[in-house]
């Protein structure tokens, strides 16, 4: 009995020691932070960045107040990641805020250092002086231009297909350059070497590491026997990732028969060199064991064979070609990528801010079947198109309360109907609708461009093929096949639409064009009728300042309607007619109607067959230094836009 008692006592001591050891393990990593920083401060928001570490964390985030030493009892934002990048939104203008990060366990609460910042005053409605004009225009050819602004040098960049790129400090004078590629052994690697060996070879899902060594070049070679990488580096999108402290280029490595991938390349400087990190998404695994070369099993789990839904001869009707990325942060600080071309629809994935790659911890439950896919476990959520209807070059930008989605329909050649369409949503991942409330996501196949378009003319027709307009877009230089655009709500208080255009009589030659964009009274985007040449009108001024005096409006105008269903094969263009805006508010001439100004604003309505709600501003009629009142407007019931400009010397 004594021996049993002694044995029980020893066991009890052992249990106590074990329990104590377990307790020590629980608290051995203290709660801690890297230094909290605040950046991107503007009128109503700011971005807080910090890293929270420690064991058994229950909550982490930032708290803020207009008084010093904020606590978790004040306004707070929670984070599910240790590397926190949180956007403080809804702030008052010209107000000082105090911010602290916090991390909490079951037994402890720790705060970071305190940072204070003052939001900017409300957006300026004062025009910037126009210090330059049409003489500053220096053209550049960049196909599929994606625009990005480098705050450190106050320089705009456009990156495009086939390694074309250019930079400008005024969006008018462009200088071309080529960003070099890097590998482990070279800072100026060849195209054939740059995409074979990723720097990142492991990714994490659910806390577990998985090997991922993807040769992007070898994958795209599967589509053809005579593959040439030099013509297949398509449509990059470049963004600054503050968590990674890197410039991130998302580049399409295109291959025939959908053997394509979007890869991440990073650089310390925006002009490179860029080094291949890892794939973000891959397409084309529809036969055999090809999927074993991709990250499909990391996303879905181990598969005995390729899932039946991917074994299809209708890949282009159901799934995307993994090209044409658009990467952006939403207003809550999440990182997203929309992508896809040309016929399977536009899809969207959430990315990991720490790696810039796919967020493998976000799952996508299958929705839909057959060709009617709405959500795919691998490709993500479909937000537009599908069923072999055309659509590519998605671009999403948050402007004035909405996420705007641009998609380009049609074929990219000069006479194949390339044309931008616009949708919007309150959420980054949709649903996206046009001004008629028609969805960007299609329920079946439609012809969605050209004279036989039968989709109800989905998507605002922000501009299309046009000619005999002003002094530049005339005759053989008339614009057509405009598309694969990007758009930027720029730090100068203006929004710019950037696209490439072909021309009526110049073959397949193309150039970049930039137009300022405004929101009309209904919040839809309308593009200025002429190329940007340094006009200083701020977006915030449109709703509160009348830029063109009522007395300056009457006179003779050229009026151009951007029509749907142009016959591009027949080289059809939209061309202007002559009308007169009379002082009594009537319109006479080739079309008749009325016009009116909303008092105290630049909002103008022109009623013809429909009512076009838009804005009236002064523009320069490039290439001359001739200024004129110009109108741009949208009839939201049809999606049709119109432009008008007043004749000189009226």
What are the roles of these predicted feature ranges?
Residues 2, 95-96, 524:
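Intrinsic low-complexity, intrinsically disordered segments enriched in polar/basic residues
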Residues 3-10:
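Sec-dependent signal peptide recognition
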Residues 13-14, 162:
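Processing junctions and N-termini across compartments
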Residues 16-19:
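C-terminal motif of bacterial Sec signal peptides marking the signal peptidase cleavage site
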Residues 21-122:
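Short, surface-exposed linear motifs at loops/turns and structural transition points
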Residues 120-650:
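Carbohydrate-active catalytic/glycan-binding domains of CAZyme proteins
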């Amino acid at each position: 009995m004594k021996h049993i008692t002694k044995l029980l006592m020893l066991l009890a001591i052992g249990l106590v020691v074990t329990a104590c050891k377990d307790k020590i393990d629980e608290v051995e990593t203290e709660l801690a932070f890297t230094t909290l920083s605040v950046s991107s401060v503007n009128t109503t928001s700011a971005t807080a960045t910090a890293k929270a570490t420690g064991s058994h964390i229950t909550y982490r985030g930032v708290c803020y107040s207009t008084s010093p030493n904020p606590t978790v009892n004040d306004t707070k934002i929670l984070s599910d990641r240790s590397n926190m990048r949180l956007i403080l939104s809804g702030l008052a203008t010209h107000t000082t805020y105090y911010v602290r990060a916090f991390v909490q366990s079951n037994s402890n609460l720790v705060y970071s250092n305190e940072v204070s910042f003052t939001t900017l005053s409300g957006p300026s409605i004062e025009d910037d002086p126009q210090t330059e004009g049409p003489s500053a225009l220096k053209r550049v050819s960049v196909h599929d231009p994606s625009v990005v602004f480098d705050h450190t040098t106050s320089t705009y960049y456009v990156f495009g297909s086939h390694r074309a790129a250019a930079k400008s400090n005024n969006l008018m004078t462009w200088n071309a350059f080529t960003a070099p590629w890097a590998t482990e052994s070279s800072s100026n690697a060849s195209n054939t070497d740059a995409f074979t060996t990723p720097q990142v070879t492991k990714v994490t899902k659910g806390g577990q590491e998985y090997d991922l060594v993807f040769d992007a070049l070898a994958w795209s070679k599967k589509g053809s026997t005579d593959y040439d990488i030099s013509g297949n580096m398509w449509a990059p999108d470049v963004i600054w990732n503050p968590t990674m402290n890197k410039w991130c280029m998302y580049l399409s490595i295109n291959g025939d028969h959908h053997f394509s991938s979007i890869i991440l390349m990073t650089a310390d400087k925006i002009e490179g060199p860029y080094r291949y990190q890892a794939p973000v998404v891959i397409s084309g695994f529809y036969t055999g064991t090809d999927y074993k070369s991709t990250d499909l099993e990391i996303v879905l789990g181990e598969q005995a064979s390729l899932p039946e839904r991917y074994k299809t001869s209708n890949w282009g009707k159901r799934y995307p070609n993994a090209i044409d990325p658009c990467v952006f942060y939403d207003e809550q600080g999440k990182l997203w990528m929309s992508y896809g071309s040309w016929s399977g629809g536009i899809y969207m994935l959430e990315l990991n801010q720490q790696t810039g790659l796919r967020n493998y911890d976000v799952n996508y439950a299958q929705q839909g079947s057959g060709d009617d896919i709405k959500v795919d476990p691998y490709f993500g959520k479909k937000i537009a198109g599908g069923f072999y209807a055309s659509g590519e070059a998605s671009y999403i930008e948050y402007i004035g309360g909405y996420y705007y989605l641009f998609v380009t329909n049609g074929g990219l050649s000069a006479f194949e109907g390339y044309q931008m369409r616009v949708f919007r949503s309150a959420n980054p991942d949709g649903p996206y609708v046009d001004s008629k409330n028609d969805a960007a996501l299609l329920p079946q196949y439609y012809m969605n461009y050209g004279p036989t378009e039968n989709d109800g003319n989905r998507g605002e027709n922000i501009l299309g093929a046009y000619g005999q307009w002003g002094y530049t877009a005339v005759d053989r230089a008339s614009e057509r096949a405009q598309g694969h655009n990007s758009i930027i709500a720029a730090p100068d208080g203006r929004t710019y639409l950037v696209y490439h255009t072909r021309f009526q009589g110049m073959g397949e030659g193309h150039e970049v064009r930039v137009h300022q964009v405004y929101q009309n009274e209904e919040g839809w985007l309308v593009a200025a009728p002429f190329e940007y040449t340094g006009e200083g009108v701020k977006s915030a001024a449109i709703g509160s300042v009348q830029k063109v005096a009522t007395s300056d409006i009457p006179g003779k105008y050229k009026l151009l309607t951007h029509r749907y269903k142009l016959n591009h094969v027949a080289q059809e263009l939209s061309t202007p007619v002559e009308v007169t805006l009379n002082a009594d508010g009537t319109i006479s001439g080739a079309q008749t109607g009325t016009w009116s100004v909303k008092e105290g604003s630049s909002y103008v309505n022109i009623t013809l067959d429909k009512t076009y709600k838009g804005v009236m501003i002064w523009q320069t009629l490039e290439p001359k230094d001739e200024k004129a009142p110009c109108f741009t407007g949208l009839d939201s019931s049809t999606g049709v836009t119109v432009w008008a400009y007043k004749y000189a010397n009226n």
